[in-house]
């Protein structure tokens, strides 16, 4: 195998053509800075101290490279990373077209693995990672709650309202209102005080002691509570379903006590004796009266 250890001829041609451009004693080379590559030149200054200058002359840069030389590099398969001078024709075939390079290096594409291109690709790879995209959750959090929708059917609305009312009633504590039972309270007061006049009831309320009032009020309230409990129990019993046969409920009669035959015989004898003695008494009384009458 023939191994080509000599440097490529394209590099020699580059150095030959670049020598007539650089009139001064200058060493030029390309340095890739982020975000854009620039040509940095070291010029000899006073006391032979090198001075770094940047030369972005497009004409000088274009004369260094031609279309034939770039094609020659592609034929020799020289990698882009090893070549110190990027070809000028690669601007038209730039893989990254969305990124605009600097105006001084308009024909030079940016590095595909540079920090700006990598950041742009990472930012716009997905919309979730893009900070400019507003997420739906944030919109829902900012949007006010939607007003209640109108009911499609009146039955559903009424059922919903009744269920809400029932829940409220179940959660609230019911306090009995005795103002609705004034008539019953007055009737109880009339029964206790044995009167039918409101004036006497008012007089008793004015002159009665606090203990008497408390006792009477407790008695009235207890009686009214018992009445309410009885009515509630009756309503519950009436709401219970009747038996499936449809027969009316039979009222149970009190149990009859059967007496033995000896006791029945004795009771019959006693009744006969009482019936026999009554007429004798009457007759004796009548005979006595008859006896007394002639004496008078």
UniProtKB/Swiss-Prot annotation:
Ranges for region Disordered: 89-121, 138-162, 232-296
Origin superkingdom: Eukaryota
Annotated Polar residues bias: 153-162
A Pfam family that the UniProt record links to this protein: SPATIAL
UniProt xrefs under InterPro entries: TBATA-like
Biased composition annotated in UniProt, kind: Basic and acidic residues: 112-121
Comp. bias (Low complexity): 245-260
Protein name: Uncharacterized protein C4orf17 homolog
Species annotation: Macaca fascicularis
């Amino acid at each position: 195998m023939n191994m080509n250890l000599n440097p490529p001829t394209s590099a020699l041609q580059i150095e030959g053509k670049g020598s007539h451009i650089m009139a001064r004693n200058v060493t030029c080379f390309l340095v890739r800075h982020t975000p854009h590559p620039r040509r940095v030149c070291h010029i000899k200054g006073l006391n032979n101290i090198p001075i770094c200058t940047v030369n972005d002359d497009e004409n000088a840069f274009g004369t260094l490279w031609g279309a034939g030389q770039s094609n020659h590099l592609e034929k020799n398969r020289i990698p882009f990373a090893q070549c110190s001078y990027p070809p000028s024709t690669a601007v038209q075939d730039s893989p990254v077209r969305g990124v605009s390079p600097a105006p001084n290096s308009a024909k030079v594409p940016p590095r595909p693995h540079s920090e700006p291109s990598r950041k742009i690709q990472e930012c716009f790879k997905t919309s979730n990672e893009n900070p400019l995209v507003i997420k739906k959750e944030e919109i829902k959090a900012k949007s006010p709650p939607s007003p209640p929708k109108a009911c499609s059917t009146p039955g559903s609305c009424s059922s919903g309202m009744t269920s809400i009312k029932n829940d409220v009633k179940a959660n609230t504590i019911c306090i009995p209102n005795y103002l609705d039972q004034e008539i019953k309270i007055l009737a109880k007061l009339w029964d206790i005080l044995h009167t039918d006049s409101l004036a006497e009831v008012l007089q008793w309320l004015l002159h009665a002691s606090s203990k008497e009032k408390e006792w009477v009020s407790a008695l009235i309230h207890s009686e009214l509570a018992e009445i309410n409990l009885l009515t509630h129990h009756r309503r519950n019993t009436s709401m219970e379903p009747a038996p499936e046969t449809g027969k009316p409920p039979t009222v149970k009669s009190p149990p009859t006590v059967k007496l033995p035959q000896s006791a029945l015989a004795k009771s019959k004898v006693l009744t006969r004796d009482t019936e026999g003695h009554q007429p004798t008494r009457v007759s004796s009384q009548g005979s006595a009266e008859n006896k007394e009458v002639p004496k008078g």
